[in-house]
């Protein structure tokens, strides 16, 4: 029996189940999106939504921008949130979702399965649960930023994230 055939089938199934990461490289550099806009990327839609500041006030005056500074740690383009949230319209339900991020100031918002959190940064979410989903944050903090990756593990039926000076890349859903 040929042992490589079953292995290649397993690899193909793993690639299919893991879905495609949204890397934003199909977006025009420096494009700006205001609250209420939709971003079509990687065959998916991302809605740009209002943002909640640390004091609880909601703002609709922010914007998103396609950036290529590499702060989030991915390659090519990334999305920058300036007082906005990104509502990812993915093929739910998911069993896992990962993303790379950079926080250069201000607070962050995250919502998983309609469980909304407004936090000073993502470090405090490590080893917690949001919306019944386990959260793991691996990040490095220095004087001016926090850069890392968040892993959401569990039944995911909705995902929104954003910040004030926040970059995101390589949003990878797993069904």
Language-model segments: residues:
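Short N-terminal leader segment in a subset of presequences, especially plant chloroplast
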Residues: 8-12, 30
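Intrinsic low-complexity, intrinsically disordered segments enriched in polar/basic residues
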Residues: 3, 20-21
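Hydrophobic h-region of N-terminal signal peptides that target proteins for export
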Residues: 13-19
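Bacterial N-terminal signal peptides that target proteins for export
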Residues: 1-9
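Surface-exposed, well-ordered secondary-structure segments
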Residues: 21-175
